[in-house]
UniProtKB/Swiss-Prot annotation:
Name under which the protein is recorded: DNA primase
Family: Belongs to the herpesviridae DNA primase family.
Repeat in keyword set: no
Cellular location(s): Host nucleus
Subunit structure: Associates with the helicase and the primase-associated factor to form the helicase-primase factor.
InterPro entries for the chain: HSV_PRIM
Its job: Essential component of the helicase/primase complex. Unwinds the DNA at the replication forks and generates single-stranded DNA for both leading and lagging strand synthesis. The primase initiates primer synthesis and thereby produces large amount of short RNA primers on the lagging strand that the polymerase elongates using dNTPs.
Superkingdom to which the source organism belongs: Viruses
EC number, as in UniProt: 2.7.7.-
Gene Ontology BP terms: bidirectional double-stranded viral DNA replication; DNA replication
The organism of origin for this protein: Saimiriine herpesvirus 2 (strain 11)
CC annotations in GO: host cell nucleus
Length: 835
């Protein structure tokens, strides 16, 4: 292309042909005679050019444009203006046979050589000059034509363009011009919306257009073609403004998000709510009016949409997702003061007195008690055993446990695995304190209790056992689980921690830092219930032991912990003095609050980011009736009887120099059970029966409140609007219409079973159809074995315009019908109050 040609104005033309465009393009390139015509459908020459010659770039829509050009060049025509004007503005087509006079074949080679290089790879081809593409196209014509179909969106009908860009002249013209001829990253819907803001008039309808020639005639002669430059300018201004507003919203959201510790779910809800506040329907309509073509130049320079973010919502987010303000602002509890609340009887550890049995033995024991004490009437299962364990002689003259123990007192219930059998155990007097004093060796150093916490932990030695004992009595000394008993007050908070991790080697200092952080969080949360001395209050940590890695070498120094997926701890701490929890609900609520406190602690999240992917590290399921948890210093028994995961003491009492009392208390069974009675006698105990997070799930509830509200109860809506029962309404209004469809689409054999039916309301929006002349047969198949298990019913669905869509459904239990899978057959739409 010489310098003179470079100076000619260039215009893009979206063209069509009166035949197969791929074949016609190939004919033109190969010089094959053709009678085809080329039509201008759309172009970006908005006024008559004044130059003598111009360059027309003939284009076709890209089949898969992605983020690239929406139309791709096919030919460049160097053509006289007097020939181009009728083609562009007066629907006069160009003959395909004449195009070779105007085509820039150098540009054509540049366009099509990459295609030819690909399809001719490793294929024999004519030995011609590299610049001669005509011979290659002739040689590989079929593949070349197929490649054009994959590259360009080729269609003989303009229907796809009309349905895509609009069925009226003005929005179609403006939307299509900007979409095809301008550089942008917009969806068609966005451009269509911009066209409606630019021009309210719609122009003529395009519904009746059937050919590209007709469509090109409308676009080329449209009076609105000359407004395209103004529309393009408006689009660029509007999109720049939208980008400014969007960036301001993102900045506002990200600024607040950076201050909050949000789970993935909460983050999604927060972003949704924030965008909803800025871009809900009302605000979007106002903003669209503010930025239409008449007002766009008068919009304030400052951002508009970001100002819609609700300050109260921001305040709620900042306080709810901040640890200190969360605990002070949103946590409440209800309590009463009760005298003489007691838990388990203190264990003097002088003798081992217990009863043990399997489920059948539990049943027999409780049956005997119900027989001898009929007024007690307890269930003869585990729940009954828990009820029995919670009864003492305070309010009963009789000793209900007289067939087991000499005296009646409140006792713990344990579970023990022995010889692949589960035993339920009630213990009146325990000896675990004595057992642990012999099986656990304190550090050998003089004044060991003055050492650092980690040094004491490293020097405490357990006499470990790896296989189950020979007797149940001995097995109870090394493995048992305490059942949570909701009939007894809770004196000690027992926590089961499963902390998900992504590393496999942990030094003792890392674990200690974790324990110190958890201790601080637990005590800070406990202060909600009563006064706690942060320095001296005992919080016991028992870490589940982990095995050495399989590839460990003997001469390699061992790390303290090799846990891979999660760290397991049992954490136990007494409640504040004079405070008890009643039942499982306040315990569950408290632990849920503790979980949330952990999830918004930045220090802990920095150490263990996987916390955000769960509901929290503390298991709340262990506090339900019938659930149990392994007590400290004991083993888990696996299916083969092997003992594993011993819960060893991990000392964490950082603010007291002398750890003796702390360590000794951690081996006292009276300090380690849910319902162990506090030895300090308090006349009036503060009994907490309800703990609540007043703003729990507020972000989820707020998000749900913004979703479109629909009335899902169709039956209730129908009955209230029609003043009829649902069965009468179906029989009078809906069934006659549906029955006409049934007669139209089902065979007479199937239809006959619907002549005599009645209706019955079922659950949800389901109406059962009951045959009065026998059972229904399958509506899909004629089974060889006539099944009597066919269910026919109607499903009701409300529509926004006060109508109901009734769908005839069936279920057949035959295997050929996918064994009871629901099948929809036909639907009819019925107004609620109009026949």
């Amino acid at each position: 292309m010489n310098e003179a040609t470079e100076a000619w104005p260039k215009f893009k033309v979206l063209f069509a042909t009166d035949g197969d465009s791929a074949e016609i393009i190939t004919d033109i390139l190969t010089g094959t005679d053709t009678n085809a015509f080329i039509y201008s459908v759309l172009h970006n020459c908005y006024i008559y050019p004044t130059e003598v010659k111009i360059v027309l770039i003939l284009c076709l829509p890209a089949k898969k444009p992605g983020g690239g050009d929406k139309c791709l060049e096919v030919f460049q025509l160097h053509i006289d203006t007097e020939l181009a004007i009728p083609f562009l503005f007066y629907t006069k087509p160009l003959k395909a046979n004449d195009l070779h006079k105007y085509i820039d074949f150098k540009a054509a080679r540049k366009n099509f050589k990459p295609i030819l290089d690909i399809i001719s790879t490793n294929k024999p081809s004519p030995k011609t000059h590299n610049s001669d593409i005509k011979s290659k196209i002739v040689w590989f014509r079929a593949k070349f034509v197929n490649s054009l179909r994959k590259l360009y969106k080729i269609s003989s009908s303009p229907y796809w363009m009309i349905t895509t860009f609009g069925s009226f002249e003005v929005p179609f013209l403006l939307t299509a011009i900007f979409y095809f001829f301008e550089q942008h990253n917009c969806t068609i819907n966005t451009i269509f919306h911009l066209s409606s803001l630019f021009e309210k008039k719609l122009g003529t309808s395009l519904i009746a257009i059937t050919t590209f020639e007709e469509l090109g005639g409308v676009c080329s002669t449209s009076d609105y073609l000359k407004t395209a430059p103004a529309f393009i300018n408006y689009c660029h201004i509007k999109l720049a403004r939208d980008s400014l507003e969007s960036q301001a919203i993102d900045t506002s959201i990200d600024t607040l998000r950076g201050q909050l510790m949000l789970s993935n779910q909460d983050l999604v809800h927060y972003i949704y709510l924030s965008f909803f506040q800025c871009l809900n329907k009302d605000i979007f309509i106002k903003y669209s009016h503010l930025t239409n073509s008449d007002n766009i130049h008068f919009v304030p320079e400052t951002e508009v949409l970001a100002q819609s973010l609700d300050e109260n919502f921001r305040k709620d987010m900042l306080t709810y997702y901040n640890k200190s303000t969360y605990l002070k602002t949103y946590i409440t509890h209800k309590c009463i003061h009760l005298p003489d609340l007691i838990g388990y009887a203190p264990q003097d550890c002088t003798s081992f007195v217990y009863w043990a049995g399997q489920s059948k033995n539990v049943h027999n024991l409780l049956n005997v008690i119900n027989t001898t004490h009929p007024h007690i009437n307890i269930s003869e299962d585990l729940n009954g055993l828990l009820d029995l364990a919670a009864i003492d002689s305070t309010f009963n003259v009789d000793n209900l446990k007289d067939c087991v123990f000499n005296e009646s007192q409140k006792v713990p219930v344990y579970r023990c695995e022995f010889l692949n059998k589960t035993y339920f155990v009630i213990v009146q007097n325990d000896i675990l304190k004595n057992v642990w004093s012999t099986d656990v060796l304190m550090p050998m150093q003089e004044n060991w209790y003055m050492l650092k916490d980690t040094e004491i932990t490293s020097n405490i030695s357990y006499k470990e056992t790896f296989t189950s004992m020979l007797t149940l009595r001995d097995q109870l000394k090394i493995s048992r689980h305490e059942y949570f008993n909701p009939r007894l007050p809770v004196f000690n908070l027992v926590l089961d921690l499963d902390l998900h991790i992504h590393t496999s080697e942990h030094e003792i200092d890392e674990i200690y830092n974790l324990c110190c952080t958890l201790r601080s969080l637990i005590l800070e949360t406990l202060q909600l219930l009563g006064p706690v001395d942060i320095d001296t209050h005992h919080v016991y940590f028992f870490k589940s032991t982990c095995e050495k890695p399989e590839n460990w070498i003997d001469n390699k120094e061992l790390k303290f912990c090799y846990c891979t997926k999660k760290l397991g701890f049992r954490i136990i701490t007494p409640l504040p003095a004079g405070v008890v929890l009643l039942g499982s609900n306040p315990v569950i609520s408290f632990v849920n609050i503790l979980n949330r406190t952990i999830k918004i602690d930045k220090k802990l999240l920095a150490m263990y980011p996987l916390i955000m992917e769960t509901d929290g590290p503390f298991d709340v399921g262990i506090y339900h009736k019938g659930r149990c948890v392994r007590i400290p210093h004991t083993y888990k028994v696996n299916s083969s009887g092997r003992l594993e995961r011993l819960l060893k003491l991990f000392v964490c009492h950082p603010h007291v120099d002398n750890k003796l009392q702390y360590v000794m208390d951690s081996f006292d069974i009276n300090n380690l059970l849910y319902h162990s009675h506090n030895p300090e006698k308090v006349k009036q105990l503060k009994a907490v029966y309800d703990i609540a997070d007043t703003n729990e799930n507020f972000i989820l509830q707020k998000a749900q409140a913004q979703l479109p509200q629909t009335n899902h109860n169709a039956v209730e809506r129908i009955e209230s609007a029609s003043h009829m029962s649902i069965t009468d309404w179906v029989a009078e209004f809906a069934w006659p219409r549906l029955f006409e469809l049934i007669k139209l689409y089902l065979s007479e054999e199937k239809v006959s079973q619907f002549y005599h039916v009645s209706f019955a309301a079922s659950t949800g929006n389901i109406i059962k159809i009951i045959s009065l002349s026998g059972n229904f047969s399958c509506l899909n198949f004629k089974h060889r074995l006539k099944t009597q298990s066919v269910r026919i019913f109607l499903s009701l669905h409300l529509t926004p315009d006060n109508c109901v869509t009734l769908t005839l459904m069936s279920q057949c239990f035959a295997s050929k019908c996918n064994s009871n899978k629901c099948i929809a057959h036909m639907s009819v739409r019925v107004p609620i109050t109009d026949k």
